[in-house]
Amino acid sequence: MSQVWHNSNSQSNDVATSNDATGSNERNEKEPSLQGNKPGFVQQQQRITLPSLSALSTKEEDRRDSNGQQALTSHAAHILGYPPPHSNAMPSIATDSALKQPHEYHPRPKSSSSSPSINASLMNAGPAPLPTVGAASFSLSRFDNPLPIKAPVHTEEPKSYNGLQEEEKATQRPQDCKEVPAGVQPADAPDPSSNHADANDDNNNNENSHDEDADYRPLNVKDALSYLEQVKFQFSSRPDIYNLFLDIMKDFKSQAIDTPGVIERVSTLFRGYPILIQGFNTFLPQGYRIECSSNPDDPIRVTTPMGTTTVNNNISPSGRGTTDAQELGSFPESDGNGVQQPSNVPMVPSSVYQSEQNQDQQQSLPLLATSSGLPSIQQPEMPAHRQIPQSQSLVPQEDAKKNVDVEFSQAISYVNKIKTRFADQPDIYKHFLEILQTYQREQKPINEVYAQVTHLFQNAPDLLEDFKKFLPDSSASANQQVQHAQQHAQQQHEAQMHAQAQAQAQAQAQVEQQKQQQQFLYPASGYYGHPSNRGIPQQNLPPIGSFSPPTNGSTVHEAYQDQQHMQPPHFMPLPSIVQHGPNMVHQGIANENPPLSDLRTSLTEQYAPSSIQHQQQHPQSISPIANTQYGDIPVRPEIDLDPSIVPVVPEPTEPIENNISLNEEVTFFEKAKRYIGNKHLYTEFLKILNLYSQDILDLDDLVEKVDFYLGSNKELFTWFKNFVGYQEKTKCIENIVHEKHRLDLDLCEAFGPSYKRLPKSDTFMPCSGRDDMCWEVLNDEWVGHPVWASEDSGFIAHRKNQYEETLFKIEEERHEYDFYIESNLRTIQCLETIVNKIENMTENEKANFKLPPGLGHTSMTIYKKVIRKVYDKERGFEIIDALHEHPAVTAPVVLKRLKQKDEEWRRAQREWNKVWRELEQKVFFKSLDHLGLTFKQADKKLLTTKQLISEISSIKVDQTNKKIHWLTPKPKSQLDFDFPDKNIFYDILCLADTFITHTTAYSNPDKERLKDLLKYFISLFFSISFEKIEESLYSHKQNVSESSGSDDGSSIASRKRPYQQEMSLLDILHRSRYQKLKRSNDEDGKVPQLSEPPEEEPNTIEEEELIDEEAKNPWLTGNLVEEANSQGIIQNRSIFNLFANTNIYIFFRHWTTIYERLLEIKQMNERVTKEINTRSTVTFAKDLDLLSSQLSEMGLDFVGEDAYKQVLRLSRRLINGDLEHQWFEESLRQAYNNKAFKLYTIDKVTQSLVKHAHTLMTDAKTAEIMALFVKDRNASTTSAKDQIIYRLQVRSHMSNTENMFRIEFDKRTLHVSIQYIALDDLTLKEPKADEDKWKYYVTSYALPHPTEGIPHEKLKIPFLERLIEFGQDIDGTEVDEEFSPEGISVSTLKIKIQPITYQLHIENGSYDVFTRKATNKYPTIANDNTQKGMVSQKKELISKFLDCAVGLRNNLDEAQKLSMQKKWENLKDSIAKTSAGNQGIESETEKGKITKQEQSDNLDSSTASVLPASITTVPQDDNIETTGNTESSDKGAKIQ
């Protein structure tokens, strides 16, 4: 089956190739005779294929020389499909067509009879692989072996060419004809005119060609150029022949003709030139071959994969084969005088015609209309069956060719004009080319192309007008064609009748062969006035511009491409109307019933003879059926004309695309192709669609597979599903498993760079496959979290500190010395051998002696590096060259210099080793300490007040955020510490005592006070007896004195003050009291007997008593409250609370920090002590002299004793200032192996501890808070009420914005927890039992302060603002004292609180009474103008109301009015008496029955009276009325 290739998007290379081997200097030689010679490039066993070329869409211009010939440049090479000589790329083959498979070509092996080429450069050039095009292209691969084809033996006789013998034709050549270049004409080429005795040898060689595949030489660009140059040189006097040959190649590239069509047209064109015809075999695909003799009258044998056929070039006008003069516009041979020779064309014999009729029946395809994007540049073709005289046919053919050249040049000029116009806008030019290529590839309607071009050139109307010239418009040309056809109709009538008779006689014999060879179909068309020469006399082609746009055709060839998803993009056959008449006899049919081919049997009824005749009369009524499937598109039937009727040119029919609209589908595929962006994936996508069209895939599978390609593009995928009619199935919602939430590890707590702690909600998840061991040992808390970092920077050595960097530099310097010393030593040994050899040489030997590179040794670079190191870089190269060229002179000098350098380098290395050793001793252990160097700066920031408060605040926020459900209990504390070892308390006190003793920041009295404060605080808080603390400190000081060697034990013992046992922390906190005790002790030496308590400031005593008194008088009393308070009392306390402010919290945090660090060191004490005792000297460190004795000399090394005690000793020396930091750190590094780095800042932390302890004494509010702690701590019993009162008292000494902390100590477990307390947090830990919770709530509710656990933002004012008296402010203060809120209150209200629901219930019969008369006010000023105005206004309003139509006075007579007036006067008198009786009420108030209070006292929420009471004045904010509506108060808020 024939395969036509087309590359719609191939871009021609404009780079011109190099000049041909046959240059212009060889053109002046005399042309030798071509008979009996073959050019060097003609190889009988080698061939290439004919690639495609799009003449207009891929090439911008077509240059021709002055003679009309196309220049032999890269354009000519592209016609044969070759890339430019400098390019390694393969020729462009169907890059954007549907055929996207790799194709190979297989040159045939070189036979022994093929003449060798004299041009070695051409024969030895690199291969130029080209795609195989032809019938066998689908069966060929790189590893296929070409089948040998035996060429038949012909007995050739001298033949005439156009009626002339070869001798005569040679004498009639033009005088100015140029000679064949020497590079083209081989000297030893065989003579083709001789008898074919050598043909048998060729056949024998062909049989063995299978074994000679490895000997063939693939062709390249130069071979094709040589052949083109040979054609051009052969027809130098007839440039039209050369141009027609190029046009044939263009037709093949544009898929207008196939490989047999090329063979047929080339054989006809080069008739009489057997060298060119046989040379063309070189470029044919496998299975094709042309064989001809030197006699042009002999038939030409064409070998194809279907078999061997014979083409007779000398046939009758009615036959299939015509002369070149008839086919090509009659280019006759001319003699030297330019006289044309008439062509003698005899009739074709019936035997020859019968052999060709078989093939012609197979190739009766519709006329193919090809288009290269712009105009249809096809000449009206003369039918082959018309016999026109030379004188008459020459002029029309020449005119037609001129028109072709003009039209083609106009198209080229138009494209160049567009490119020049939009030089600065290349996108427009590219878009224009894309429009043309899309028109060819996708068969778009011409209207759509014109619309796109109109939009593109909307700002260039001149270009748009020029483009309209190329649109199809065949009215004028059609008329001329009809007239021309009528002139020659009569002349051809007799020839047609004769040809019809011969064809009918041969028809029946060819029926069976037609069916067998039906599958081999080749498109037949004419181009530039050349018929296809297939025995199908076709009517004249329509004029230029009369072709419809390319549409889908129906051929077996295209149907096969459709199955392979390889539809040619723009080459589709159009329905053609083939003339039917006497000239149709070669098909073996009569005029009465013209049958259709097998591909159109389904359309037989539609194109019946009656309908065909109607279509002849009405050509415009022909409406081809549009269908996208191959084989279903009808082709215009042949026109059944009577022989006497002149065939007419049919009118242009409407394009098939006009009846269908595929714009949306085409747009979808364009978008899909751009979206996929990969040719291979797009091909797979098309294969899936093909499987669905073949019913291999169902709709669900199709959508599922297409989802892989288009699923991420919602628009395309939705359109596709709608187009194929896919309806999504409803999703099944049963058994949906709840997916676990995705956790953002960036928000979790980090441990190092790689681990994150999971929250509690994600840990300990239910797992049925775990046992107790799994729950115990498996990790559910920490997860690995990689750190994403770029690896583009490559590997960098990990150097963690500057000391490790120093070790790196030392090693690099030591390596450099070792490297050059060893290299120099090797070079010295090499040169010593050479110098010793030179000393034994004679003078002549020394002069001629030279050294090779490497100096005769294995290394080629060592001595060069050494010489360049000793000498500078520039002179080093000179020395190396001299050492190679003149070793006798250079070697001794260089050897002496190298020995001198060796001694110098070794001496310097010994000196540097001392420096390196000292540096390594200093930085060796520091380089291993990766945490200690950065810890000192980080620790300073972590122990600041801001950081410590931020730490506990952030922990509280995290705990609150992680509380998932409201029933989840609140966290008890934020920080927890354990103090298992009490001896460390004594160590901390000893370090603090050391610092206080040696510091100069405090005065001596403050130093003593600080020491006592620390001891008494630790004794009181941790429940340690003071005597034990004194004994421990005394023993510590004795150990220190013994170790220091000083005898001051008596002085220490004398300092023991007996009064310290009876002094309390309160005495220390009050400066004046402590100073009095200190002074009396110095005077008497004994404890003073204080007859009265120390004096305090009266304001302080009054404030404390007021707070305590208010706290003890709750606003609610009764059995319920007493029961809750009595059951909440705790006996034998084990848990103590310290409500602290910021200063106390910071002090305690420093204490815990020192304790944790000392505890960590003490826990590893046993192991470190054992290691020190068993530690041996490191051998390599000793050998390298890395061990230093400075620590032992300074007494800082650790011996085999208690390592923890030695750490304390060094710490005291550091605090005293006797030891430098670097030696203290170095000593800890060597003893604890970089694990004691937290003690590097022990002096700084101790200093901060003493600083904050001093703040506890100096800050007045902090001292009061500490006094409250002492008072609570000394109480043996406590209750929830006492703790709440304790908290309220502490809060009274703090500002509203200051933070409060609760430090809780458990005496039994020695555990301390710190909790950050907000305003609405509970004072104590939330009880677990419901009864305990209820009792705690009642206790807090009974106290006058806001109930704990109630958010303050939910509290509201317990009265309405509109009830406030005039002149009284909202906060309860009086603006005017003239108002008197006197009243009577009787309270017998009793309430109950439900333990579970906390609802408030009022008992029946209980009530509250509160009355206050509005007249109980001080008299106002009578002459007040404002008051008078208001009174008069009210009187006037009342009088108007009474006197109105509906008023009370309306129906009263005068007597009634007087009676009412009298009653009014009596009312006034009663009011006056009531005012006089107010004095008596005031006197009884003093006796307790009636009480007078100021309004400010009533509105003060802090003052409360005991309820229930018989008669009292109730404050407004605690007004509990009989309705029990207390929701507006804070109590009601908690109850509800």
Curated annotation (Swiss-Prot):
Region annotation Disordered: where it falls in the sequence: 1-128, 149-216, 308-363, 475-511, 524-556, 1037-1057, 1079-1108, 1475-1536
Basic and acidic residues composition bias: residue spans: 166-179, 1484-1495
Any GO BP: negative regulation of transcription by RNA polymerase I
Glycosyltransferase recorded as keyword: no
Phosphoserine carried by residues: 137, 316, 1046
Composition skew (Acidic residues), residue ranges: 1093-1108
Pfam hit, one: Sin3_corepress
Note: Present with 1660 molecules/cell in log phase SD medium.
PANTHER family named among the record's database cross-references: SIN3A, ISOFORM G, SIN3B-RELATED
UniProt-recorded name of the protein: Transcriptional regulatory protein SIN3
